[in-house]
Amino acid sequence: GRFTALSGVVGKIITDPSLTGGIAEIGAGLRDVLGDEVGKRLTAPLPDEIQEVLTDARLRLGDVNDTLIAIDTKNEDAKQRKLRAQTMTGRSISQLDIAIEGREGHVAFVSGSRESPRLEIAPLDVGPTMTEGVWSKRTAILTSATIPSSLAERVGMQTSEVEVADVGSPFDYAANSLLYNAIHLPNPNDGGFRAKANDELEALINAAGGRTLALFTSYRAMDEAAEEMKSRLDMPILTQRDLPKPALVQAFTDSEETCLFATAGLFQGVDVPGKTLSLVVIDRIPFPRPDDPLLSARRDLLGPAAFSQIDIPRASMMLAQACGRLIRTSTDKGVVA
């Protein structure tokens, strides 16, 4: 983890084992108290046990930082090691301060897993940081097939200084693709939706002869649909749980009748040209999770405008990226459903 790495870096310039060992202990202490907080925001005042561990960590790193400052060396290699240790220590101290005291414009939250939680500190608005560190110093060229119109404002660019070029697409979507919307299905919140959706999915996959990338907004929906289709269809069904992403995509590519069921991790970065991928099925509009700690804090900041400024743009971008898995070359054809 981060503090194990920091202990190693500091150990190259400080030889006192009580200091370097103390850094390694910070990681273990944080793991013990943050494991149950994964996926949650940390707001002041913190629970006592978390406050105690974070405060102890802050004091230990303060001692390390004081020791680093006191080191006087003329050796260039040692100077570089000292600088790196100070930089990493200072960054960790700053993050702990924000988590302990809170800081306007920042949010503290815990990511990772219960076994390996990570304390994260993120700005609610990246614009000032980007302006100071990038836009005021460099000319930048940003390219993507899915750049939202609001990007310049979101990342702190002066819109008067931004030039936008839309080069269009080399693909003839109208001639090579169809959009199928199963408007006859019941509301997704209705009890009978899943059974009807499975019937629809089975019919679509059969019509395509396999060759399907089915994308879901949750692992639960993916697992349920995959199990149901395995019992109904006489063709290979792979899921995102089966293999690492590169091997999974390769296995899907190698067998034309194979179907791949996946979640948000494969809404982008999947490039399978040709007949192997002829049908992309998307189970729901991929709105971001309401309990995402960073987005939740940004929603609180924006108030009533949050849905239109955060949720809709992100869902639109994810939907566009998912649909973009279908047509990868000028000769590809298929259906998005």
Question: What is the predicted role of each segment?
Answer:
Residues G1-A337:
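ASCE RecA-like P-loop NTPase motor cores
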